[in-house]
């Protein structure tokens, strides 16, 4: 099973999370791709995709993702396992918290992918409906807030990595 971790990062927090995820799962299994430098077309060569996207300003897509956004429509991702993680500021921008994560989930949901890694909303304060499912009980991916809950990020990343590995094992069982 080969995994590609694709991310966009303007302030390095999404990139640092990518590196932590790679180190937990294993550098021999996960290849990092910064969308600033690498084409999203490379996603097609992996069985599993981990995609990291921060939300900017008032619910905007980060610039590296925005630059390749339309290219995602042309990718053949049928049958791939996809785990998403997002970064945002829940207190300063609660009504747009992780909107980009929700938009990425929506964009990929028509591509025949199998999502893993939905994450509980408990412990977060926000009002945006975009990044959640299951009556608001789950985010569509790991939710990180390096502004207000940075002290929880390492534990959340560790737990989420264990969760997605278990969910992938069930898929391949």
Swiss-Prot record:
The gene is fldB. Its cofactor is FMN. GO terms for molecular function: electron transfer activity; FMN binding. SUPFAM superfamilies: Flavoproteins. Low-potential electron donor to a number of redox enzymes. Residues 3-165 form the Flavodoxin-like domain. Belongs to the flavodoxin family. This is Flavodoxin 2. It holds the Pfam family Flavodoxin_1. Gene3D superfamilies: 3.40.50.360. Keywords: Electron transport, Flavoprotein, FMN, Transport.
């Amino acid at each position: 099973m080969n995994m590609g971790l694709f991310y966009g990062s303007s302030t390095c927090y999404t990139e640092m999370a990518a590196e932590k995820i790679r180190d937990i799962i294993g550098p021999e299994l996960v290849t990092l791709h910064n969308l600033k430098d690498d084409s999203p077309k490379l996603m097609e060569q992996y069985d599993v995709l981990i995609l990291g996207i921060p939300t900017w300003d008032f619910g905007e897509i980060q610039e590296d993702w925005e630059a390749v956004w339309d290219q995602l429509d042309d990718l053949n991702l049928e049958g791939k396992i996809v785990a998403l993680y997002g970064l945002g500021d829940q207190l300063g921008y609660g009504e747009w918290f992780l909107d980009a994560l929700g938009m990425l989930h929506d964009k990929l949901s028509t591509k025949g992918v199998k999502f893993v890694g939905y994450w509980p909303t408990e412990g977060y304060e926000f009002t945006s409906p975009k990044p959640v499912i299951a009556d608001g009980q789950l985010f569509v991916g790991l939710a990180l807030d390096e502004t207000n809950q940075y002290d929880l990020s390492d534990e959340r990343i560790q737990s989420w990595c264990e969760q997605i590995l278990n969910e992938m094992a069930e898929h391949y069982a």
